[in-house]
């Protein structure tokens, strides 16, 4: 072992050892408890960023810890390799998406290896390869045969920039999540998977996920949006037509004053045929923002159709309006408007001078004041004829029953969740395995024609998909008949919804999954990824697992037992303004800063001396040029230092503020550990530790060692507070550095302590600990060493420090035997000079004793 800590030499040597020995390669072993630790697979964008490093370091720490507990640990990695960015990069770099993607994978794979992550690389999965997506295509055809897949023309979120459909979840503030272009509404044929058929399971099984963050479960519950209500049919006056609405507030039904329908509703289109102004308004609605946040805040617009609906209980004639806040995709595309008790309906009614009728009293029994806003609380009905005086639940039931009895109502459970649109009008994705025959019949691609292989040698023009531009690619046959292949490709969430299961059997070629391997490893024991995936990936991930279960491929109900959502990585951001007012962002690595006495940045300049504006800490991003390249940090400080800083600087689920001074601090700590572990063996052989021969000082130090082991074990295993685990190890190291080394028992105790420190640090800093383990005489490789176990006997304290109070005020501290009872503590306390002084001439009225901690004497 060398005297100085040189990570550049140590880390490459240790990584080579892991590679040559297949250290992290695993197979199913029924005799060992399994543990499947998985971080969300990366998109191969070209380079790792610090968000990746944080995610994968957390996963690696957990995996190595569980391995030291003796478990059979699977930690795989792969590549979510399809996706739109590859198309843009291919056009920009005059290449095709495939070579760009494969080159990125090679580069990023090397970066992952340099960080020392303990992956089983034999299970690497690349989702753009036909041997992966063939099974996705096969499964899709099975879902089609089961009636869980269908095609329909529907209004979709269309990104004109990317020329593709976006899921509702991919529309952020009315714009495309990827390119920030304003989203339009467009009617095109789409393939859908019936996630709504599993809505109840997805909702109720959230209760089984005891080790998932409540925030994620709440977001999923809200997204599924189960509601109980009534579907009501209105007759259109002077017509055979009807329209249907769904409401969760039938108790307010007698307050309905108009009906609003979506621009795409059949009644809207019928009325527009003879009304050019209405036709123009409907066209305007097609570009309306569709994200819910926008729907809530945008200006409410509408136009009367001239039609009227007949109120089924009162016979009142209710005007039918087209409104921009009603969407065909939600419910029935029509809503009953109760402006007295719904704020959106109220705003619309005020704008267009429509009647407002109150039908629910205030909590105090008074009539609501509707001059400024709607009264949306539940209460007792009035102005409602025979239903007057009923409370919410009674009113709900009575009006629902009346509608059902008349044949114009039906109690229904509705969901906010919509079926999953999986069609994308792009090239770089898995081809959808469906065909259209000459007579228009749509059929699934036969199994013997799978996979439908995506051609990789293509020329990108940046506008149309090569699949759509090449008519020959689509031509095929079905049972000897000419047929055309589907030229849409799958949403890339399809690939990332089942990759975790394929890791259990990546080379299996007789089916989608090897049931024996899949059911040995699944469910995932620990899943790690960002909270931003709560309602897209994590919902589809759960849905797909239930589909796999119902196909007989897995036996568990949920894909992952425990979920950890790591926080974002932030860094300082700086910019200057050009003469035109444009912000130019400058990398923090190129900025010199001055700080005040509290460490706050008060001045910043770039290399040319230009003064910059400090924009605070923000998420590392290309747009703000404040990303820190992990590779540069690894080359400067070593992978172990970067890993240690990432785990120490913040609780895992909180945001992490990147500070290079913190990285330097982590590096100094590792050097201290290295120095002590180097110097210790240099002093000669170490004898056996004789626990019975330890003096009080040695016992106290050994107690600290084993209390630290207990704390670190709990922090990593149960609490997952990795930063406090590291802090405890650092605190112990400070004590070890000051510990005497005069006797054989001093040295034997330090040996036990250092070996424990190295084992506890191993999940965080595996390269250094691999080397130190050998230097300290550890048996075999530390990769196969057991986790240290705290000695309960060592943690028992011989004595306790008890705080003494008189009438709640501190009057002294005394040391008593650990097993001292209240009487002994009172006796010792009364002998303390300051305590005795405050007891003089008084009577002890009450004794409050917290064993081993505090004695409070209440006197009078």
UniProtKB/Swiss-Prot annotation:
CDD domains: Anticodon_Ia_Leu_BEm (cd07958), LeuRS_core (cd00812). GO terms for cellular component: cytosol. It is an enzyme of class 6 (ligase). Its main location: cytoplasm. A motif ('HIGH' region) lies at residues 42-52. The gene is leuS. PANTHER family: LEUCINE--TRNA LIGASE, MITOCHONDRIAL, LEUCYL-TRNA SYNTHETASE. Keywords: Aminoacyl-tRNA synthetase, ATP-binding, Cytoplasm, Ligase, Nucleotide-binding, Protein biosynthesis. GO terms for molecular function: aminoacyl-tRNA deacylase activity; ATP binding; leucine-tRNA ligase activity. It catalyses: tRNA(Leu) + L-leucine + ATP = L-leucyl-tRNA(Leu) + AMP + diphosphate. A motif ('KMSKS' region) lies at residues 619-623. This is Leucine--tRNA ligase. ATP binds at residue 622. Transmembrane segments: none annotated. The lineage of its organism: Bacteria, Pseudomonadati, Pseudomonadota, Gammaproteobacteria, Enterobacterales. It is found in: Cytoplasm.
């Amino acid at each position: 072992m060398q005297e100085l800590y040189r990570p550049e030499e140590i880390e490459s040597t240790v990584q080579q050892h892991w590679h040559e020995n297949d250290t992290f390669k695993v197979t199913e072993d029924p005799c060992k408890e399994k543990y499947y630790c998985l971080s969300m697979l990366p998109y191969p964008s070209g380079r790792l960023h610090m968000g990746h490093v944080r995610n994968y370091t957390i996963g690696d720490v957990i995996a190595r810890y569980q391995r030291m507990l003796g478990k059979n640990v699977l930690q795989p990695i792969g590549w979510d390799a399809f996706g739109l960015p590859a198309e843009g990069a291919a056009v920009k770099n005059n290449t095709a998406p495939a070579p760009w993607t494969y080159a990125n994978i090679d580069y990023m794979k090397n970066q992952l290896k340099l960080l020392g992550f303990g992956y089983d690389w034999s299970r690497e999965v690349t989702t753009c390869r036909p041997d992966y997506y063939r099974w996705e295509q096969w499964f899709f055809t099975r879902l089609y045969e089961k009636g869980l897949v269908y095609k329909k023309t529907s209004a979709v979120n269309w990104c004109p920039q990317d020329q593709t459909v976006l899921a509702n979840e991919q529309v952020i503030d009315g714009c495309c999540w990827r390119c920030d272009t304003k989203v339009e509404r467009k009617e095109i044929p789409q393939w859908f998977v019936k996630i709504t058929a599993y809505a109840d399971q997805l909702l109720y099984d959230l209760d089984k996920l005891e080790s998932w963050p409540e925030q994620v479960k709440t977001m999923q519950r809200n997204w599924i949006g189960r509601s109980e209500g009534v579907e009501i049919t209105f007759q259109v006056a002077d017509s055979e037509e009807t329209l249907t609405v769904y409401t969760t507030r039938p108790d307010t039904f007698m307050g309905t004053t108009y009906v609003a329908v979506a621009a795409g509703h059949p009644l809207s289109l019928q009325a527009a045929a003879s009304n050019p102004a209405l036709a123009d308004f409907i066209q305007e609605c097609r570009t309306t923002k569709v994200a819910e946040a926008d729907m809530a805040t945008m200006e409410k617009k509408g136009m009367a159709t001239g039609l009227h609906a007949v109120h089924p209980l009162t016979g009142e004639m209710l005007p039918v309006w087209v409104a921009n806040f009603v969407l065909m995709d939600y419910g029935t595309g029509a809503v009953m408007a109760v402006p007295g008790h719904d704020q959106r309906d109220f705003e619309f009614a005020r704008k267009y001078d429509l009647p407002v009728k109150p039908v629910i009293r205030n909590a105090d029994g008074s009539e609501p004041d509707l001059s400024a806003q709607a009264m949306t609380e539940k209460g007792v009905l009035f102005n409602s004829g025979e239903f007057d005086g009923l409370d919410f639940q009674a009113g709900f039931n009575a009006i629902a029953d009346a509608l059902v009895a008349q044949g114009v109502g039906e109690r229904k459970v509705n969901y906010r969740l919509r079926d999953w649109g999986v069609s994308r009008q792009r090239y770089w994705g898995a081809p959808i395995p469906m065909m259209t025959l000459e007579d228009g019949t749509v059929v699934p691609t036969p199994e013997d024609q799978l996979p439908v292989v995506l051609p990789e040698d293509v020329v990108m023009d940046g506008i149309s998909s090569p699949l759509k531009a090449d008519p020959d690619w689509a031509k095929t046959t079905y049972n000897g008949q000419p047929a055309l292949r589907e030229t849409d490709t799958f949403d890339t969430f399809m690939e990332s919804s089942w990759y975790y299961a394929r890791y259990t059997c990546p080379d299996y070629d007789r089916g989608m999954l090897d049931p024996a391997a899949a059911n040995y490893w699944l469910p995932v024991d620990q899943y790690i990824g960002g909270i931003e995936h709560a309602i897209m990936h994590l919902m589809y991930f759960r849905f797909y697992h239930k589909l796999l279960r119902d196909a007989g491929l897995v036996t568990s109900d949920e894909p992952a037992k425990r979920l950890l959502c790591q926080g974002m990585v932030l860094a300082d951001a700086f910019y200057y303004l050009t003469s035109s007012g444009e912000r130019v962002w400058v990398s923090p690595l190129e900025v010199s800063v001055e700080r005040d006495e509290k460490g706050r940045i008060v001045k910043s300049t770039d290399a040319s001396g230009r003064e910059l504006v400090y924009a605070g800490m923000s998420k590392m991003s290309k747009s703000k040029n404040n990303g820190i390249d992990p590779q540069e940090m690894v080359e400067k400080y070593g992978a172990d230092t970067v890993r240690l800083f990432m785990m120490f600087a913040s609780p895992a689920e909180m945001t992490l503020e990147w500070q290079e001074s913190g990285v330097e601090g982590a590096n100094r700590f590792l050097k201290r550990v290295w120095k002590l572990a180097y110097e210790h063996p240099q002093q000669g052989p170490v004898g056996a530790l004789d626990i019975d021969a330890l003096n009080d000082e040695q016992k106290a130090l050994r107690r600290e060692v084993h209390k630290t082991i207990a704390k670190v074990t709990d922090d990593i295993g149960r609490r997952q507070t990795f930063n406090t685990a590291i802090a405890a190890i650092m605190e112990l190291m400070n004590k070890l550095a000051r510990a005497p080394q005069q006797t054989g028992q001093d040295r034997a105790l330090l040996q036990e302590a250092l070996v424990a420190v190295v084992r506890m640090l191993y999940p965080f800093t595996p390269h250094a600990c691999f080397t130190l383990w050998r230097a300290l005489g550890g048996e075999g490789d530390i990769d196969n060493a057991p986790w240290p176990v705290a000695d309960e006997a060592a943690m028992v304290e011989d004595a306790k420090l008890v705080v003494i109070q008189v009438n709640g005020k501190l009057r002294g501290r005394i040391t008593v035997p650990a097993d001292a009872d209240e009487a002994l503590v009172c006796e010792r306390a009364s002998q303390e000079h300051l305590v005795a002084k405050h007891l003089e001439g008084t009577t002890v009225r009450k004794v409050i004793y917290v064993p081993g901690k505090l004695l409070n004497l209440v006197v009078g």
